[in-house]
A protein has these predicted regions:
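Low-complexity, intrinsically disordered Gly/Pro/Thr-rich segments
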Residues: 80-88
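Short, well-ordered alpha-helical segments
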Residues: 21, 26, 34-81
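N-terminal presequence-like segments and the immediate start of the first folded domain
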Residues: 1-33, 71-75, 86, 92-107
Length: 107
């Protein structure tokens, strides 16, 4: 499956549009990570615990979007966009949404 943030794939023809496809993931951040993040916020430095969770969440959202595109018969996704949104009390959860347009391109 080809994924691109552009509205076309160079050298390929969009034969059919299958519609908008999404992948959504909501993950909680545990108190241990919150404690570490608060400490690093005070002392400075990157918060790898949160970064790792974002990487996992983004990959899960993209994979879910791919499955949904395949379910509607698409073999590529164009116009891919990824959004992040804190959720829950004090931002204790993160929502990651991957979206794009499922298309059938010439092989």
């Amino acid at each position: 499956m080809i994924l691109t943030t552009t509205n076309e794939i160079s050298g390929k023809i969009n034969k059919e549009y299958k519609g908008i496809v999404f992948g959504e993931v909501i993950n909680g951040i545990d108190w241990g990570r919150d404690f570490t993040a608060a400490f690093k916020n005070f002392t400075g430095g990157r918060v790898s615990e949160y970064e790792d969770e974002l990487i996992r969440s983004r990959a899960d959202a993209i994979n879910e979007m791919i499955v949904r595109a395949q379910n509607v018969g698409a073999n590529a996704i164009i116009g891919v966009k990824i959004d992040y949104e804190p959720m829950g009390q004090n931002g204790g959860m993160i929502m990651v949404v991957a979206s794009g347009t499922g298309v059938v391109i010439e092989e």
